[in-house]
Amino acid sequence: MPVFMFDEHDNLNENYNSHLSSDDEIAEEGYDFEELEASASTITSSSDLKDGKNAKDEKGTVEFKVAAHGDFISSKGDNYVPSGKMRPADFQPLTVLGRGSYGKVLLVKQKNTGRLFAQKQLKKASIVLRAKGLEQTKNERQILEEVRHPFICRLYYAFQDHDRLYLILQYAPGGELFSHLAEQRMLPEDVVAFYTAELTLALIHLHKLGIVYRDLKPENCLLDAEGHILLTDFGLSKVAENGADCRSFVGTEEYCAPEILLEQPYDHAVDWWSMGILIFDLLTGSPPFTANNHKRIMEKITRAKPNIPFYVTSDARDIINKFLKKNPKQRLGADGPEKGYDAIKKHRIYRRIDWNKLEKRMLPPPIVPCITNPEAAENFSVEFTKLPLSTTPILHEEFGNLTIGSHSSAFQGFTYVASPNFLNCEFLSNNAVSNH
């Protein structure tokens, strides 16, 4: 299964089990860019996105954009000066961790420090040819910069060359939670409680920042060297400005809340629906609403009750049913920080969780990844780690009339370097996998 999901569809991912799917730095203002051809004329312009205003799509539904002062502009402000820009040549590729329609993810070693990172590569041409590719890329880049949480994957650098964007992310040597689930088929309730508790803290943090995650599933839950959760892939995440509802028809179908499938306005409550699906999946080995076609899956999600197996305990059964309320206002967690979050934490399935210690990473994880050589990516699928490292040239013919790298304003300001304190202290304390 994929390590990082590059969503290649503007709407739903069509397959729940689909596989993810010159190095000189180029000055961001130094491109000779041409206009997009008519075939890509529907792409939202950067000027439409940067002011954070609401816009309507072709169906008349409202889209809410990430509030930013400019395309990919750092929240540090105009006075923020990166301590040292990176470029592809600064990193040695070691192995492939995942791939998709937008690009791929590599395990890389920073040449001057020896530190290991996950390098997410995104092909510019693929991004601009998708109607929402620019918006999703901007959202992911902006959110990753803003978020600081022990159970959310960190962004350390962002840069670009002529053909690609690069995100240098925290490497999670424990691999996907999905891989551990696939190996064991079903996870014990105490294990499920621990990891969904860590995910709950991550989601609460995002919701307090006004971010709706929208793609919670085992493939997007990684394990660090100690076995703690790292939530990753924010390509479908959205900042709902001033508490406004979202309307985009996105997500992974089996994990989508009814209100998304029915194209109704929705908010952070969709993430708690996905949490209920995730708990069911981890306990039983599959999501509750499955079928061999999209229409049947949609009918089950919007109309049917989950068929919970007899061996699921009463506590787990109760929280699943409370998360999977069709009416989002009745859903556990929907009340937000005042009541909803406390109600989740006080549920009996989490009775053994000390939430203060959990957030400080003081509770031992139930799964400790076997890591004999962090550079070998032992906990990732051999389907990807066996792939060649060579970068495939991007051909003009591959994208019709679109000239590669012909859209300067769209990617202006993408570069990012985390503060020295964050790079050194955070990395050494939480991600020193080479000493594991």
UniProtKB/Swiss-Prot annotation:
Keywords: ATP-binding, Cytoplasm, Kinase, Nucleotide-binding, Phosphoprotein, Serine/threonine-protein kinase, Transferase
InterPro entries in UniProt: AGC-kinase_C (IPR000961), Kinase-like_dom_sf (IPR011009), Prot_kinase_dom (IPR000719), Ser/Thr_kinase_AS (IPR008271), STKc_AGC (IPR045270)
Catalytic residues identified in the record: 215
Subcellular location: Cytoplasm
Stretches assigned to the AGC-kinase C-terminal domain: 351-426
Chain positions found as Phosphotyrosine: 102
UniProt-annotated binding residues for ATP: 97-105, 120
Subcellular location, principal: cytoplasm
GO molecular function terms attached to this record: ATP binding; protein serine kinase activity; protein serine/threonine kinase activity; ribosomal protein S6 kinase activity; signaling adaptor activity
Mod. after translation: Phosphorylated by ksg1 and target of rapamycin complex 1 (TORC1), affecting the kinase activity of psk1 in a nutrient-dependent manner.
Pfam families: Pkinase
Role of this protein: AGC kinase which plays a role in TOR complex 1 (TORC1) signaling pathway which mediates temporal control of cell growth in response to nutrients. Required for phosphorylation of ribosomal protein S6 (rps601/rps602) at 'Ser-235' and 'Ser-236'.
UniProt protein name: Serine/threonine-protein kinase psk1
Source organism per UniProt: Schizosaccharomyces pombe (strain 972 / ATCC 24843)
